[in-house]
A protein has these predicted regions:
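Active/ligand-binding-proximal structured segments within catalytic/core domains
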Residues: 1-34, 227-239
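Non-catalytic accessory/assembly modules
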Residues: 69, 83-116, 166, 173
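Solvent-exposed, non-transmembrane alpha-helical starts
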Residues: 9, 66-69, 105, 173, ...
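Non-catalytic, conformational "gating/processing" segments within enzyme and secreted inhibitor domains
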Residues: 85, 92, 143-178
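Non-catalytic beta-strand/loop surface segments
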Residues: 3-4, 30-64, 101-157, 181-226, ...
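M16/insulysin-pitrilysin zinc metalloprotease superfamily fold
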Residues: 25-28, 59-91, 240-243
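Divalent metal-coordination and catalytic microenvironments
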Residues: 16, 56, 72, 95, ...
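Bacterial peptidoglycan biogenesis and beta-lactam-recognition machinery
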Residues: 23-27, 79, 168-169, 179-185
Length: 244
């Protein structure tokens, strides 16, 4: 249960950086073996990061469930055993290139980034991009990154979901087998982003190397699953979900 909303000013991009580092090998899974083992079992995997959570998933046949649980437990318990400064530097560069491709070098990328900083006050955990700033990524030390992992990557701060053609009792036994000895982390305070309220209309005009002008409109809306959220999803779909 960690996303960019758990980060602090000056330490942005850590949640997304770990989405990359988690696939780089752990104590009992050599670099590259995570994907190779799953592919050999007919499974696929990926991950994603938002402001509120980081998600890792594996889709595969039910007879590969134990392999999936072993791989997940090993990187939760033993990632730091193999997370060298060189490995962090390598994935840091990958993330910075990803940012260039998705923001700096993409038409309209910067205005989309600026919208969050206009909707949320400076220092609010939703005011920066999930991918982090170039400055923060460059400044992140190996010790900073290790501390982030120790704080958030523990069984008491994670949810495990197993679904599909499984025997529930057998699945629970496998979960117990592979996760029971993974040590709990320290209690993680729940993230409660300070309430944001716009008191006036904010406008910003930007110049970029694009062929056509573009207008962005943004509003602060109720939190997910709160009253009004579903209705606004429908309104957004009606206003911007199609060409007509």
């Amino acid at each position: 249960h960690v996303g960019s909303g758990s980060e602090k000013p000056g330490r942005t991009g850590f949640a997304h950086l770990f989405e990359h580092l988690m696939f780089e090998g752990s104590k009992h899974v050599p670099e590259g073996a995570f994907d190779t083992l799953l592919e050999g079992a007919g499974a696929n995997n990926n991950g994603s990061t938002t402001v509120d959570r980081t998600n890792y998933y594996i889709n595969g046949p039910s007879n590969a469930l134990e392999l999936m649980l072993f791989l997940e437990s090993d990187r939760m318990a033993y990632l730091l055993d193999t997370m060298s400064p060189e490995r962090v530097d390598g994935q840091r560069d990958v993330v910075k290139n990803e940012r260039r491709q998705s923001i700096e070098n993409r038409p309209y990328g910067i205005p989309e980034l600026e919208l969050d900083s206009m909707l949320f006050p400076t220092g609010h955990p939703y005011s920066w991009s999930t991918i982090g700033s170039m400055e923060d990524l460059s400044a992140a030390s190996h010790e900073d990154v290790q501390e982030f992992f120790r704080t958030y990557y523990a069984p008491n701060n994670a949810s495990l979901v197993v679904a599909g053609d499984i025997d529930i009792a057998a699945a629970k036994a496998l979960v117990e087998k592979w996760f029971a000895e993974v040590p709990r982390g320290k209690p993680v305070p729940p993230v409660a982003p300070p309430a944001a309220m716009l008191t006036e209309v904010t406008r910003r005009t930007m110049t970029d190397q694009v062929q056509l002008p573009r207008l962005y409109l943004g509003w602060l809306t109720p939190a997910t699953y709160q009253p009004g959220d579903a209705a606004l999803d429908v309104v957004a779909s009606l206003l911007a979900g199609g060409k007509n």
